[in-house]
């Protein structure tokens, strides 16, 4: 079992402020770094930037990125955040951390030294180590090139605005953003290339793509037999879930610069793909380590009681889970659930009960530090909950499941936190973090190559859930990119196909 001695008291205590200086930040950072190394936290080098509340709101509005291309939606988000913040209806995060190499962490200058220490432990060592080591981030993102790529994207889109007009570029980005969640291949992992390679390939990609589009949309087949075979074959041969990629490669009317912008939005969507699937784990891991590191410093006598009281007050607020019948309830707090599960894994390893040995025979009594790193590296929220959610955590959170069947006019409590309900609760909760259950399953089904060039999308409902009424507006964006008629079908449980929408609509069809 891993044992790390944190009880050697040090009579030299760090200043507890509350005001901070850059020198004091350096001292705290050095101590946090020393403790983090004891727990084998493997991180990227970090770059810490202290910013104002207005700069933090600006970072909020640009989805936390240090630089981004221009679009009205970012300004709208800034104004909304600023209004809520100034009226006291919304607070600001103490930090924002960027999955990059070096890992960029933004600290609010209004923070006390206690909060700055918490943020450095949370972001620079918790999130940072998660970004570097979790399998989804390793497979789907390239931390060393994201900032350079965003600089390239900003420059390219700005040049397009100057050449083709702001309105034209804005309309294209509107459509790309509307389909951003459908810009990732979930099973085909992206190839990692440097910014220099990206630029070198850009010109050749433009020429190649246009030649491929010309080949796809040629109207005069060489031989009659070729025509017959082509008409009998559906295109694409398999349904395609990556709508933006398909548009980039196949939309008949897009120009090369428009295809490049689609590619840029796809790349940004791909960057955020792991984050959507690891919020509980990522925040839980970072919260576990800021709690562990700062308690370690207190046990060593490095920080004061006043420091700890302020820290624990903030930490308790972060991991508070309102009950289901509270007016402040808005779902399960990912900080609370993630922190509780990592704490529980440590407990199961160090002091397993008979219940723990039955539920977790592989990890009960094992090295807690090794087990925690294994859980962090090789799981995402769905599988993490399915594998490690224990009966104790279910009891602590008082979990129960509510079955809402659209075929009945009542709700059913199908499981509670007891022996009969543990497995169902765990399965139901993990399925809530399955991205396939959270986003509509809409795929490109067919293109009428030899007819009117119409595009057919097919929606396969999950648990008979209907599409939102906003589907009409989204279909307009698909039509803008494709350039020809677009149809949206639904495949029902009995296998029948139903036409939901057509853009542009035809009189008498809908």
Curated annotation (Swiss-Prot):
Pfam families: SpoVR, SpoVR_C. InterPro entries: Spore_V_R (IPR007390), SpoVR-like_C (IPR057008), SpoVR_N (IPR056174). GO terms for biological process: DNA damage response. NCBIfam families: PRK11767.1. To B.subtilis SpoVR. This is Uncharacterized protein YcgB. It comes from Escherichia coli (strain K12). The lineage of its organism: Bacteria, Pseudomonadati, Pseudomonadota, Gammaproteobacteria, Enterobacterales. The gene is ycgB.
């Amino acid at each position: 079992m891993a044992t790390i001695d944190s009880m050697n008291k040090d009579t030299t205590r760090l200043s507890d402020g509350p005001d901070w200086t850059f020198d004091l930040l350096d001292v705290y950072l050095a101590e946090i770094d020393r403790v983090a190394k004891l727990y084998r936290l493997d991180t990227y080098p970090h770059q810490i930037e202290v910013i104002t509340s207005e700069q933090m709101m600006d970072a909020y509005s640009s989805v936390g990125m240090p630089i981004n291309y221009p679009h009205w939606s970012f300004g709208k988000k800034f104004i909304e955040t600023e209004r809520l913040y100034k009226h006291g209806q919304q607070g600001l995060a103490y930090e924002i951390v960027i999955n990059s190499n070096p890992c960029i962490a933004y600290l609010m200058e209004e923070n006390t030294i206690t909060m700055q220490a918490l943020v450095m432990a949370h972001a620079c060592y918790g999130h940072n180590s998660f970004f570097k080591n979790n399998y989804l981030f390793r497979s789907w993102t390239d931390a060393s090139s994201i900032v350079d790529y965003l600089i390239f994207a900003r420059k390219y889109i700005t040049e397009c605005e100057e050449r083709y007009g702001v309105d034209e570029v804005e309309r294209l980005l509107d459509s790309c953003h509307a389909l951003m969640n459908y810009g990732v291949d979930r099973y085909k992992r992206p190839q990692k290339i440097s910014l220099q390679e990206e630029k070198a390939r850009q010109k050749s990609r433009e020429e190649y793509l246009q030649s491929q589009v010309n080949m796809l949309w040629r109207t005069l087949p060489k031989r009659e037999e070729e025509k017959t075979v082509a008409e009998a074959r559906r295109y694409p041969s398999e349904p395609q879930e990556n709508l933006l990629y398909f548009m980039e490669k196949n939309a008949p009317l897009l120009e090369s610069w428009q295809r490049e912008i689609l590619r840029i939005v796809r790349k940004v969507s791909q960057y955020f793909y792991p984050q959507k699937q690891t919020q509980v784990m990522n925040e839980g891991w970072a919260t576990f380590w800021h709690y562990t590191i700062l308690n370690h410093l207190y046990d060593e006598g490095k920080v004061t009681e006043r420091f700890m009281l302020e820290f624990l007050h903030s930490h308790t607020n972060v991991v508070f889970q309102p009950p289901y019948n509270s007016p402040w309830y808005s779902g399960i707090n990912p900080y609370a659930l993630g922190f509780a599960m990592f704490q529980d894994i440590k407990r199961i390893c160090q002091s397993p009960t008979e219940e723990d040995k039955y539920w977790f025979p592989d990890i009960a009594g094992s090295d807690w530090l090794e087990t925690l790193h294994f859980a962090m590296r090789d799981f995402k929220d769905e599988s993490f909950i399915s594998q490690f959610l224990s009966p104790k955590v279910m009891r602590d959170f008082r979990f129960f499941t509510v079955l809402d069947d659209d075929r009945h006019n009542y709700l059913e409590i199908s499981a509670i936190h007891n022996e009969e309900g543990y497995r169902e609760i765990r399965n139901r909760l993990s399925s809530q973090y399955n991205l396939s259950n959270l986003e509509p399953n809409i795929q490109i089904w067919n293109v009428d190559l030899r007819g009117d060039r119409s595009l057919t999308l097919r929606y396969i409902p999950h648990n008979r859930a209907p599409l939102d009424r906003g589907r009409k507006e989204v279909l307009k964006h698909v039509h803008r990119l494709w350039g020809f008629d677009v149809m949206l079908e639904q495949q029902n449980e009995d296998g029948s196909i139903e036409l939901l929408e057509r853009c542009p609509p035809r009189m008498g069809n809908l």
